[in-house]
Amino acid sequence: MAYTQTATSSALLETIRGNNTLVNDLAKRRLYDTAVDEFNARDRRPKVNFSKVVSEEQTLIATKAYPEFQITFYNTQNAVHSLAGGLRSLELEYLMMQIPYGSLTYDIGGNFASHLFKGRAYVHCCMPNLDVRDIMRHEGQKDSIELYLSRLERGNKHVPNFQKEAFDRYAEMPNEVVCHDTFQTCGHSQECYTGRVYAIALHSIYDIPADEFGAALLRKNVHVCYAAFHFSENLLLEDSHVNLDEINACFQRDGDRLTFSFASESTLNYSHSYSNILKYVCKTYFPASNREVYMKEFLVTRVNTWFCKFSRIDTFLLYKGVAHKGVDSEQFYKAMEDAWHYKKTLAMCNSERILLEDSSSVNYWFPKMRDMVIVPLFDISLETSKRTRKEVLVLKDFVYTVLNHIRTYQAKALTYSNVLSFVESIRSRVIINGVTARSEWDVDKSLLQSLSMTFFLHIKLAVLKDDLLISKFALGPKTVSQHVWDEISLAFGNAFPSIKERLINRKLIKITENALEIRVPDLYVTFHDRLVSEYKMSVDMPVLDIRKKMEETEEMYNALSELSVLKNSDKFDVDVFSQMCQSLEVDPMTAAKVIVAVMSNESGLTLTFEQPTEANVALALQDSEKASDGALVVTSRDVEEPSIKGSMARGELQLAGLSGDVPESSYTRSEEIESLEQFHMATASSLIHKQMCSIVYTGPLKVQQMKNFIDSLVASLSAAVSNLVKILKDTAAIDLETRQKFGVLDVASKRWLVKPSAKNHAWGVVETHARKYHVALLEHDEFGIITCDNWRRVAVSPESVVYSDMAKLRTLRRLLKDGEPHVSSAKVVLVDGVPGCGKTKEILSRVNFEEDLILVPGRQAAEMIRRRANASGIIVATKDNVRTVDSFLMNYGKGARCQFKRLFIDEGLMLHTGCVNFLVEMSLSDIAYVYGDTQQIPYINRVTGFPYPAHFAKLEVDEVETRRTTLRCPADVTHFLNQRYEGHVMCTSSEKKSVSQEMVSGAASINPVSKPLKGKILTFTQSDKEALLSRGYTDVHTVHEVQGETYADVSLVRLTPTPVSIIARDSPHVLVSLSRHTKSLKYYTVVMDPLVSIIRDLERVSSYLLDMYKVDAGTQXQLQVDSVFKNFNLFVATPKTGDISDMQFYYDKCLPGNSTLLNNYDAVTMKLTDISLNVKDCILDMSKSVAAPKDAKPTLIPMVRTAAEMPRQTGLLENLVAMIKRNFNSPELSGVVDIENTASLVVDKFFDSYLLKEKRKPNKNFSLFSRESLNRWIAKQEQVTIGQLADFDFVDLPAVDQYRHMIKAQPKQKLDLSIQTEYPALQTIVYHSKKINAIFGPLFSELTRQLLDSIDSSRFLFFTRKTPAQIEDFFGDLDSHVPMDVLELDVSKYDKSQNEFHCAVEYEIWRRLGLEDFLAEVWKQGHRKTTLKDYTAGIKTCLWYQRKSGDVTTFIGNTVIIASCLASMLPMEKLIKGAFCGDDSLLYFPKGCEYPDIQQAANLMWNFEAKLFKKQYGYFCGRYVIHHDRGCIVYYDPLKLISKLGAKHIKDWDHLEEFRRSLCNVAESLNNCAYYTQLDDAVGEVHKTAPPGSFVYKSLVKYLSDKVLFRSLFLDGSSC
């Protein structure tokens, strides 16, 4: 052991001494590698050739000053000021290094030849000829270019490639390369450039006035300007000559003229303004506009050249804190008292920020001046007695050392000689340990005598002042002043005989008869002080004139003093009062006196309230005998009508509206609307009606239909106005690039806060500065909408493009008599014809254009009829006898003819029945022919919440004629028509096979280049139409828009992969789409749907059978199971039998083909192959496109083959695909919805349907915020979550509209066959930070608890943390003897379909439960326009609304939305049982209940792609609910259980055991086999191919209950 320790110590000592050869070799190798790396790095620097002859010292100067370049000194060119000229090239390259390559750059006064030689084709040089020298310099640059080109030509060489673009640009467009205008007036255009713009100024800013520099940069949209200029700190002293030793140049100053020249050279001098240069040095901010400013920042000083940059700053982006709108009256009065003091100080304020205010900045940017002070030196001529003064920079430490020492001298020792001796001694040497080492202070020896005199004089005067302060007395016959002069004369001897006169002239002393006052001057000033004084002497400091403002403030102060006598005057809103006086141009004192008179009841006007609260104002302004000012009142009937002139004089305008019986107090007198101008500036509130659903119509059916039509117009207008008002209230400054269907114009800035997709809107809603809302008829000029001074914002929407509803209401109002419409006695004949039966042809053959009228719904159809009628060349069909319905209603009475003999209405069944009745009445005809198709698209009520009863949809006619022979449709389509119409449908077409379909791989594959479409292009939805138009297709329409049209060839396109309710086998839209063509129709779709099935069926019909159209329908029967026992479930233990093959067989029978998929490498394939994606606006960080590789750990291999996938690795592509297929794939199906009013009605139904009657009102004594609620929330959180809140101070709210985005690594298995044709997207999670959850989590937890406590739990189950046993108890009292309909609402894209309407419904529910208004508004804004950031994948995007899958209200919010949706559509008062959970629902209704069109209601109101299924057994949250005669049992879905057994993410055997236990818990009910037969029936309802499955249920129980046996379902992946 001792030997080992000795050997180790010896080796260590050898290593330390450097005798270890191995260590030495390693060290040398390491040193060599480091040197190689360093030299390689240096070799990569930009190369600069220095051709001018310079000395070795100058070579070292250039190399040290610019280490960024690899400089090669050739010394081949003699020139004047060689170093400065060579450095200029380095300075230019250094400036250009700061600019991104290729960005448009302005070189102010630059050398365009240098840029051409470097190949910079993106630089424009502004080279004005300010003097003769500039012309000479420019010609020299041109000569250098000619010389270069001649050399190339002489050597038969071409311009190098890197220079070619620049030289071509100079040859073709020299004005793009260089101009001779000043930078302020440069006319260079930037039309084709969209990036950031830069500028450089190399020794050229001297000639640009500093006050114009910022504006000039902004004019060119410059982002950053880099500048370089010569300067010296000594220029700020009183010296008139300053040397720049490094470049052998000098500055000479004469007043404001500053001259620059090179020493010992005959070159011309450069002359500039000293004060202008001083501004560039001292100022920090250079204003460019009232919003933007350029901020200067010094970069570096190199070889007497100063580098800086000017950055563009938008001051509107400064953080301004939280806006405070309240008014503190005490502070206002106090401010008024101090007004004159403020006036005095504000007048002296400087509007510029200069670096002089910060001494640390001065020291930093003038590093040589850090420890220097400026000391004055004096000299006097003996001949002329003229004093001269100059200043020098001296180290502060040197000055204090001298002063502190000589201050200790006794009076006899304080002589000039002693001071000079001491100064010379400390300047000459420093003694260290008795040895002379060096001089500590480097002070010029030529200054020592003058400095010594200054120090001596200062101390002498300071001593005299101290003595005079101690005592004032006379000494003998001489006064104190005489003694002082004696002392001074003795000190200076005869050298300065006139020192007394000099001191008096210098104002250092003040003498009277017997007294002497001495003012000791400052020995020195700091560099900072001199810089400040010099700048203020050279620059006129701006003064702020606030006299006018102070006068206005004085007037306002007097007015407020007048108002102070009012009661509660401290709550008076001063801001609103001031704005009112300014907008109305009213004197504040006059307005104040009027207000005092009104409030004191001295004006003749009596107000019924003491305080102007909202309730009191509403009470005072309620309708009595007069309408409010500007009101457009909706009335049900006329009363005694006064004259229209009197109504207009009062600013009233009444509109015939909801015609049903409602309380009479809701309405006022009704006037006739004579022109559209009466709508202008009517108050928006008068057009918004909230009682659409409580209407009772009276009279004959036709009269009721006509009243309903008028009311529908009012409801449509009300919804449009209401939504526009809501938009104005909700809109803040939104991203200007965002385009929406609606638009909001900011009047002050003339910019769209939200850009609308349409233009030239006819009307809109205006928000005034007084926050009032009015409907305005808009006018336009070349600049846009013409606005008024008191308008603040204008909102428009697609409904406001034309005057349609307004003009129709005006016309129909004139037709009413005593509030009742008149019904025509004309005969009405309905011509019911199949598609293509020749309805239009028949109309043209029967019509007499001279006395008849043709009306059609659309403009295209009207043009087609005119074109066909005038085909012979004789014009018979005009705009007077062939018109659209809208045109006829809007312009009634304006044409030449008002009465017609016969009326022909084409596609009349697409119109409101009341509209048809009005058309018959208005035409004054004897007979009316209404052509239509009872099976095609009927009238669709697009105003959600407005009642359109089913019996109103039936048109009352006198006679019905049928047309069952189609002249258009081919034979295969006729075969389909026979399934839809009564009677035999025949065709005349020779075409037999005309329809076909093509499945496309995705929406992105349909574009005009790769997929040109034949014939007319049709879509089912507006979103698909807009998508095709945006990709370049033309003449695209929806099926609804072309009803009644005929085309030879049709291409029908569906791009929406999610379910669309109107695409169904019995849908009228499908019928219309199949019957538009005469030759061919091809259907392009991205998914399988009913239309594909229809087309495939038609393709299989035999040609010889196409004339046989009979279809037999089978009878549906339902098996009834009688009851045996009651009250509890019969239990029969499940035998444990079966094998793995049983589970595999059952899975393959239910989902054939899924188990054969080899999808382990689908994710890899997607990453490695080319992929084309259509995305919405988002920001992608492409550095995250390749995920960091991770070691793949082996997982267990399942023996059961299912469609389960391997866990995927998150990354840019994977996350983006998930975002596209989920967040970016939201449907747009909803119609016109009056959001606020409809939401209020829906919530009324929610509370009436689900809540106990005694708990429908919120508990006011209930506190949402309490320690208990917070503790309950914390108890549910993990420890990691609590740790994230450690640094949260809860002082302010975090950004509630900011969300993070992530995906689940494991794809969700679908129990269908979609996995065989598509790559399933991962589930996305959009979530808040824990800080936000800590605020809103306890809040919504308490609200949820309060809601669940109020639910009628005997009838409704809100599935929140319920066990299967509790579900069984809930459904256990169902009586199987009572016939029931089991309903399930299946909603596709549930989260992503939720829009503004869903948010309004949910917020209204929370509000009624007691949510505080402020937090409710915060939560609302946090779910309106939101920003998503995925830091893992590098994705950032913006979403409007949508349900966030990770915030605190995700689950309960989805639950209340699905419950609200069903309550608004189904008769919940008849419901037996109902359960809701997220997007799942299960409802039990009595057999035979009538249900509305759920698909249409879900589409138009809720934007849901929904289907309502009637079943025998319920399916709820992955479980089958089996009700029987004893009660109810809940079975977990066995197919879902088998799918989970194919999981490929099990890590190890311990993970497998946890997996088994979780499956045992959810599948516990399978241990009871008593109701396996009913379970088979329930599974068979969902999966049609499922066999009886008791054998597989037993097998599942067998493997799940045995830990060892369950391990046999998996293999160890590490051993495979």
UniProtKB/Swiss-Prot annotation:
Catalytic reactions on record: RNA(n) + a ribonucleoside 5'-triphosphate = RNA(n+1) + diphosphate; ATP + H2O = ADP + phosphate + H(+)
SUPFAM superfamilies noted in UniProt: DNA/RNA polymerases, P-loop containing nucleoside triphosphate hydrolases
Domain (+)RNA virus helicase ATP-binding: from-to ranges: 801-963
Protein's GO biological process: DNA-templated transcription; mRNA modification; RNA processing; symbiont-mediated suppression of host innate immune response; viral RNA genome replication
Chain residue ranges for the region called Helicase: 830-1085
Keywords, ordered alphabetically: ATP-binding, Helicase, Host-virus interaction, Hydrolase, Inhibition of host innate immune response by virus, Nucleotide-binding, Nucleotidyltransferase, RNA suppression of termination, RNA-directed RNA polymerase, Suppressor of RNA silencing, Transferase, Viral immunoevasion, Viral RNA replication
Pfam families membership: RdRP_2, Viral_helicase1, Vmethyltransf
Binding site for ATP: 833-840
Region of interest called Methyltransferase, as start-end residue ranges on this chain: 50-441
Residue ranges of every copy of the Alphavirus-like MT domain listed in the record: 72-281
Highest taxon in the source lineage: Viruses
Family as reported in the entry's similarity comment: Belongs to the ssRNA positive-strand viruses RNA-directed RNA polymerase family.
Subunit structure: Heterodimer of a large and a small subunit.
Protein known as: Replicase large subunit
